[in-house]
């Protein structure tokens, strides 16, 4: 039996010390037979093969019929045509009707393995010929003055690759696993050619595409087809209203509208409202037709009839029961997904569904197990093909009026995630100093199950920072995590706007190039940092100017009538959310990542060039330009002796804090000149740290050209050697007062860390101490090194292995090998 020792000391307001040791994981997942069968069926659907979307075809059909009509009306009619035309399907075992499968059916023209190999060879040969012809063509970023383009130029010109995991393998003509195999084959075949591995991956992922051609061009060029994604669509309001009442409201607004622009908006709103209502009514008919025609049991026929009756009712009347509320929520969600929606969020589902659950329990209609079965169905629906786009759920926190919001449905949702064992939805658990103890206990139980959920979000940090953006106390109290980690107000904001991501480490390159041109500019480390901050300011300003251009393009061209129908403010203002109609402003996220790499690199510059004078600027510049070839001893010293972020070392943590503080202030300052929207700083890298790292040169911390940068707010891979407490202390050292967009800190734990009750309590205390001392966010996941390494060799044995990538989870076998290796290289706590 393992003895568990726990010691928790709060050293300072923002410092914690926790010693933990424990062994072996907890109880087995509890699924009833229906959910087991439903899960297996959905996994089989995901593994069935390549899927072709019919969105472009349906939209193009409508656009051909509406030439000459106003853009907003054409957009609404195209969406209505999609809902009217798409095939509706009924799946085995499900208790929630509605699926995207009719929109994305299996693609028939998949190449054979031999054809894939031959086509890939042709693609690479043509690429190499082009490279040989064009003497100025450069297939990789060079670290030095001869490099004419900035990092941002290279990224925006699509120098990097993208398909690092299966769910972003959009519009592909071969399966992701086949793409990985053919890439591997070509890397081996051309290992001696003038081509980098990432170039091979990039060219092949672009080449193996389904030829949508004119349909896709028409969809995106005629309107353009812009839509709300990374958004919550006010499901709580809608399930209490129903479509009939909403349609009546739209008609009332339309009858009173005198302004032509408002009248056009209401006409578009009426088209999509009626289309949504008709889609759900048609699903009731589809279910009943299936019931009559399919060879199914009487019990199954009764279940199908219940779904049909709920669909029929909730179109015309508000939901009365938990089952009705969750079914209508899913229908609203699937309708938005039909137009290509991505990262749609259920937001605070334990708040708006809880009254229905509470009422049903009191009246004897449902118990916790039955509620969990329905939630399990919802969790699994989110994991169906083409639905797996980081759709989020937010739990816990406080109510709009500041009271504890955790309830029995919060617990059931967390237990559902643990039992179902799927990557989505992405759960954000809001926590604060007033939370009941059971909330942390349930969070650790869920994480222990290996599902990668939940992430913890600190109410005290995010509510305060939302108020700094100008939000009311009530709206700030109501925040949710959209998609991965991004912070928004539910039901009141248009979609999340994305700026060009800023790689903190790459900006060092520009400073070094400036020194090469003008050595007199850098005499001290302060001089170096002044130039570095100037690069940060320039990158932030470039993002602002890019948004100005995007906004000019969006004006009077970009509309999403369906999402605008459901977002607060649009009906009242008579204006689409993308044209400024929403109650709350759009957030434009200035992403930045690689804090570990940049902090370590700047610390190396300070220590070895300016403090100890062991390296000259010329030597460092030359070493980086040559990727440490001929400078192996220098690289070894940098790797061994540079203080690394993530170990609780003030020397390097101070630098990390200075960089982040400057960046956050620069982003916040953009709001002084932004007229309507808000600019927010988001310390999160999705998987940018991989594909940006692949095309970037060496860095002063000893990292070589092409290697990954550090992940989001995490340390450089494997360099946090002093345990989880020191890592969290480094994070607590950073000033997060102006972090307004989002934050991702990954925390990988061996499952043996979470055995026995004492081990669980130790982790609870660690997380609670971190939150109470001001930690903004943390996401833990359990895995062991043996499983990760074996899954690279025998993926078929590890189909259900889930890992945290950035601010989201994914099956490990659905990641490309470079991303898999980066996750393996992260420190695994509790292994020894």
Residue ranges with predicted function:
Residues 6, 20-22:
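Short hydrophobic alpha-helical segments enriched in small aliphatic residues
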Residues 25-266, 299, 303-305, 310, ...:
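Conserved catalytic cores of very large enzyme subunits
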Residues 16-18:
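Short, low-complexity S/T/E/D/G/P-rich linear segments that nucleate or cap local secondary structure
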Residues 267-278, 282:
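Extended non-globular scaffold/tether segments
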Residues 278, 282-285, 289, 306:
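Extended, non-transmembrane alpha-helical coiled-coils
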Residues 293-295:
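A conserved hydrophobic secondary-structure block that centers on an alpha-helix together
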């Amino acid at each position: 039996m393992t003895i568990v020792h726990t010691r928790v000391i709060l050293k300072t307001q923002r410092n914690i010390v926790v010693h933990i040791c424990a062994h072996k994981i907890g109880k087995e997942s509890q699924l009833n037979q229906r959910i087991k069968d439903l899960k297996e069926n959905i996994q089989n659907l995901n593994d069935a093969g390549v899927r072709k979307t019919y969105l472009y075809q349906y939209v193009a059909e409508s656009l051909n019929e509406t030439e000459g009509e106003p853009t907003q009306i054409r957009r609404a009619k195209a969406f209505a045509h999609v809902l009217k035309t798409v095939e509706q399907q009924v799946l085995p075992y499900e208790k929630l009707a509605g699926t995207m499968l009719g929109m994305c059916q299996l693609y028939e023209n998949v190449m054979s393995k031999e054809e894939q190999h031959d086509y890939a060879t042709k693609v690479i040969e043509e690429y190499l010929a082009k490279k040989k012809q064009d003497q100025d063509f450069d297939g990789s970023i060079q670290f030095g003055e001869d490099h004419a383009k900035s990092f941002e130029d290279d990224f925006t010109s699509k120098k990097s690759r993208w398909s690092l995991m299966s769910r972003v393998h959009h519009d592909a003509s071969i399966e992701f696993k086949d793409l990985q195999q053919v890439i591997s084959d070509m890397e081996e075949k051309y290992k001696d050619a003038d081509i980098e591995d990432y170039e091979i991956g990039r060219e092949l992922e672009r080449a193996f595409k389904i030829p949508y051609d004119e349909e896709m061009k028409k969809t995106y060029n005629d309107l353009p087809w812009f839509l709300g994604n990374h958004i919550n669509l006010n499901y709580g309001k809608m399930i209490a209203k129903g479509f009939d009442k909403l349609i009546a409201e739209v008609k009332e607004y339309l009858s009173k509208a005198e302004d032509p622009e408002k009248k056009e908006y209401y006409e578009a709103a009426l088209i999509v409202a009626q289309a949504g209502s008709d889609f759900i009514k048609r699903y009731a008919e589809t279910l009943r037709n299936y019931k009559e025609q399919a060879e199914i049991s009487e019990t199954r026929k009764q279940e199908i009839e219940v779904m049909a009756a709920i669909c029929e009712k909730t179109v015309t009347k508000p939901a009365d029961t938990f089952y009705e509320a969750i079914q209508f929520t899913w229908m609203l969600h699937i309708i938005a997904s039909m137009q290509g929606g991505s990262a749609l969020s259920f937001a605070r589902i334990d708040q708006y569904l809880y009254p229905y659950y509470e009422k049903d329990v009191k009246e004897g209609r449902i118990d916790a197990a039955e509620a969990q079965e329905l939630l399990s169905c919802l969790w699994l629906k989110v994991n169906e093909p083409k639905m797996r786009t980081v759709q989020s759920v937010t739990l816990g926190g406080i109510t709009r009026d500041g009271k504890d919001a955790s309830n029995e449905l919060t617990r059931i949702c967390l237990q559902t995630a643990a039992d179902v064992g799927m990557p989505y939805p992405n759960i954000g658990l809001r926590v604060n100093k007033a939370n009941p103890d059971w909330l942390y206990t349930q969070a650790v139980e869920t994480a222990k199950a290996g599902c990668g959920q939940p992430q913890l979000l600190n109410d005290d940090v995010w509510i305060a920072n939302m108020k700094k953006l100008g939000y009311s106390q009530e709206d700030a109290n109501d925040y949710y995590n959209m998609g991965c980690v991004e912070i928004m107000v539910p039901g009141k904001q248009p979609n999340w706007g994305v700026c060009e991501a800023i790689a903190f480490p790459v900006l060092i390159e520009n400073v070094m190039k400036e020194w090469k041109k003008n050595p007199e500019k850098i005499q001290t480390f302060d001089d170096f940092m002044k130039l570095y901050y100037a690069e940060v300011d320039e990158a932030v300003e470039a993002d602002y100017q890019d948004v100005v251009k995007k906004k000019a393009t969006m004006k009077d061209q970009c509309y999403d009538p369906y999402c605008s129908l459901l977002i607060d403010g649009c009906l009242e203002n008579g204006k689409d959310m993308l044209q400024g109609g929403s109650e709350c402003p759009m957030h434009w996220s200035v992403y930045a990542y690689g804090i570990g790499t940049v902090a370590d690199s700047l610390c190396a510059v300070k220590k070895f060039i300016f403090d100890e004078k062991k390296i000259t600027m010329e030597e460092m510049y030359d070493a980086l330009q040559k990727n440490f070839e001929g400078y192996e001893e220098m690289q070894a010293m940098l790797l061994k002796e540079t203080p690394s972020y993530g170990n609780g070392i003030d020397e390097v943590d101070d630098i990390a804090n200075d960089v982040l503080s400057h960046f956050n202030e620069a982003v916040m300052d953009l709001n002084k000149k932004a007229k309507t929207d808000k600019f927010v700083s988001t310390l999160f890298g999705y998987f940018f740290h991989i594909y940006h790292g692949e095309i970037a040169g060496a860095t002063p911390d000893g990292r070589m050209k092409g290697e990954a940068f550090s992940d989001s707010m995490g340390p450089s891979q494997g360099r946090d050697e002093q345990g989880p407490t020191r890592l969290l202390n480094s994070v607590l050292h950073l000033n997060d007062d102006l972090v307004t967009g989002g934050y991702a800190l990954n925390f990988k734990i061996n499952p043996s860390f979470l055995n026995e009750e004492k081990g669980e309590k130790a982790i609870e205390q660690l997380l609670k101490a971190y939150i109470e001392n001001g930690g903004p966010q943390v996401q833990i996941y359990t895995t062991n090194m043996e499983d990760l390494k074996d899954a690279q060799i025998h993926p078929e044995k590890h189909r259900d292995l889930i890992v945290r990538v950035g601010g989201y989870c994914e099956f490990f076998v659905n990641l490309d090998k470079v991303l898999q290796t980066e996750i393996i290289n992260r420190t695994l706590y509790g292994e020894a």
